[in-house]
Structures are given as structure tokens and as C-alpha cells.
Amino acid sequence: MSTIKDLNLAPSGERKIRWVEAHMPVLRDIGSDFAREKPFAGLKIALSVHLEAKTAYLCRVLEMGGAEMHVTGSNPLSTQDDVAAALAAKGMDVHAVYGCTDEEYQAHLRSVLSVGPNIIIDDGGDLVHLMHTEFTDLIPQVIGGCEETTTGIHRLRIMDRAGTLRFPMIMVNDADCKHLFDNRYGTGQSVWDGIMRTTNLVVAGKYVVVSGYGWCGKGVALRAKGLGAKVIVTEVDPIRALEAVMDGYEVMPMMDAAAIGVIFVSVTGCKDVITLEHCERMKDGAIVSNAGHFNVEIDMEALDRCADEIYEARHNIDAYRLPNGKTIYVIAQGRLVNLAAGDGHPAEIMDMSFAVQAMSAEYLVRTRGQLKPGVVSVPAEIDDNIARRKLKAMGVSIDSLSCSQKEYLNG
């Protein structure tokens, strides 16, 4: 039996799913293939991804392929209750409620793992971690899994180096059709959508501090610049810092940037990027947000412990009045700003990311028993297939190499 907020919310969620389906042509095309070929017939898939409409459509595409789906969210504040209800109303096993406690969140993860999945689709690594700590007896029946995020892949690589990862995990985030588009264009747009709809403040003319200049940070900085902000980048990697300088941004240590910025976006995948000491240096009224996976980039524990007063300033914005008299505003409790305070990436972008997930899951079944435990790259042919499908859907044609050109390039 599903664990959701209210089944009566299903019609609203169904409308959302139909909308994204109309704007995800590649995934729709793959769904048609799956419906015909049934690659997942007789298999159980456990999925933990931010549970909103685009994820719901991915679940339905996998179900078209014959999978028995067991679904939960990957963040308590990103679940959309109406979408969860829409899936449950059609008979899918769903365990996700917006705003659930950490204990309830863990219970939801356990619910989808307890069925004994054959494939795991993860976002941040929580399912895989729990499988290796509490459900080890079920590991032999796991064919493999797919990981969506930079943070999750980081956790998997640690396990892989330690020799503790006991089944193959495909690094979906590292696929070109994922990180070059989802991380840069998707994050860039959705982060500012979340910040602007939550604060209702202008970005133009303000100093924006972007912590981290990976693909996600590049996207956030680019869109901030396009909105008229004066962008400062903080980094620990000298190569990325140099990239930011060459891209026209100011680069400085976080302690220096803290005294200048008005809006802060942490997008590193690391912990304690914005600390209490940084917050104490910020201007009165500074706005702090996180676009990394977990709510550890901002030291929320220190803020909760040291603030003289904490109150809700606006829906999804908490005010922290510090002992020095300044008030700092934190969006969505320091959780993912684009999902906890918005609808996540545009459907057209997630069309490619979730196409990689779907085709990678099918690849796991097709190569069952051939892949060794550990992290596995997305095959180049999957990237190529998805890119060609996307171009076709967009009505874009490209050239192809002639025989003589191929001979020249191949020696």
C-alpha cells in the first residue's frame, strides 16, 4: 500500500504529468520502444528521485517497459503530493510525502527496497547506501543501478575505491547528454526560477556570489549575469577559478565575498561551504540558498543553534536574526532551491537526462552478468542515440562524414 498525502490530489498531478509528457519527445519515443519490447518484464525497479511530474513520467516509461515500479522521493521538500497521488491512483507503489520528517523519509526508502529490487535508480546515493547497510541479503538479486547526480557519484566512487560497492552502478551524471545540458542549462534556469519566485526580488544590480564553478555553477553564474547581476565566484579548484576569471567574473575567497554579496548560491556538492562565520560577515538582509544535493552546504545546524530569533519571513524563507543584529534569509531550509522552492529543471532538459536513465537501465538488463561491480560509464552509443533523437525532435539536421573523411580521421 502506498504512503502518500491524499489520493484526491491525483487529478492535479495527472495534468502536470501530461504537460511534461508533451514536452519530452525523446523519452516519449523511448517509451514507445519499451512498450513494444518490454525489456523490464518481470523485473522490479526501486527509484528514488525528486518526485515531481518529470520523474513521474520517467516512472511511467519504465512501467511501459514491463517494470514493477516502487517509487520514493530523494528529498523531503521536493516531493509534489499531487504527482505522487497521480502515480498511486494508477496502481504504482509510491512512498513520498512533502515535508516528511527525516525518520519518515528513511522509512520511505526502506519501503521501496524491502520489495527486493532488481534495478535501482538513485539520486544522491541514499538507496544504494541503505541497500549496502540494511538490505545486504537482497543484494544478490540486484542487476545494477543508475545514479543521477554529481553528489551520488562522489559517494559511489568512495565505495568503489574501498571495494564495498557490490553491483554495477552507471554514472548517468557523467553522460554528455546529462551534464552538458542538465547541469548547465537546467540548473542555471531552475535555480533562478526558484529564487525569484520565492523572494519576488529583482536580481539586476545585485552582487550574486556563486560558490562552485563546475557545470552547475557555470549555469547559475551565466544566468545571474544575464539577469543583470554582478557575479562573484568562489572556488577551491585553481583550474575552475581560472575559467571563471576568463569568463569575466570576479573570483575571491568566500570570506571576502561574504561581505559583498546580497544573494548567495552554493553549488559545490561539499559541506560547510557557507558557515556561521561567513553569515556573520554578510550584509543585513543577505539571501542564502543551496543548489547542491544535500542541505549540508550551508551550516544550518550552526545557524539554528546561534540565532537569537528564527521566524518565517515569507513562504519558504526563514529569517535568522544573529547576535550581531543582522538578519540573514535562508531559502527552503538550505535544501535544493530549484526543487524545494520551484518545479526543478525544464521538461525539455530533463527529457535528455531521463532518457539517459531509461536507456542505461535497459543497458543493465541487456548486459546482465557482464558488468563487474563498481562505477560504470554510460556507453557512448547511448549518448549518441539520445542526442540524435533530440535533434530530430527539434527539427535540426547535421552533416555526416564522408568515407574519405572517415579514412583521414582514422588514419
Name every feature range the model reports, one short phrase each.
Residues 2-40, 71-79, 84-206:
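Glycine/serine-rich phosphate-binding loop and adjoining beta1-alpha1 elements at the start
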Residues 11-26, 40-44, 52, 167-205, ...:
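Adenosine-phosphate binding glycine-rich loop
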Residues 47-55, 75-79, 125-127, 215:
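Gly/Ser/Thr-rich loops at beta-strand to alpha-helix junctions
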Residues 49-67, 178, 182, 186-261, ...:
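Glycine-rich phosphate/diphosphate-binding loop of Rossmann-like nucleotide-binding domains
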Residues 66-68, 92, 138-140, 167, ...:
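A short helix->loop->beta-strand "cap" motif at the edges of active sites that frequently abuts
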Residues 73, 120-123, 136-151, 270, ...:
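ADP-ribose/adenylate-binding Rossmann-like module
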Residues 115-116, 259-260, 281-284:
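Alpha-helix C-terminal capping/helix-to-coil transition sites in glycosyltransferase folds
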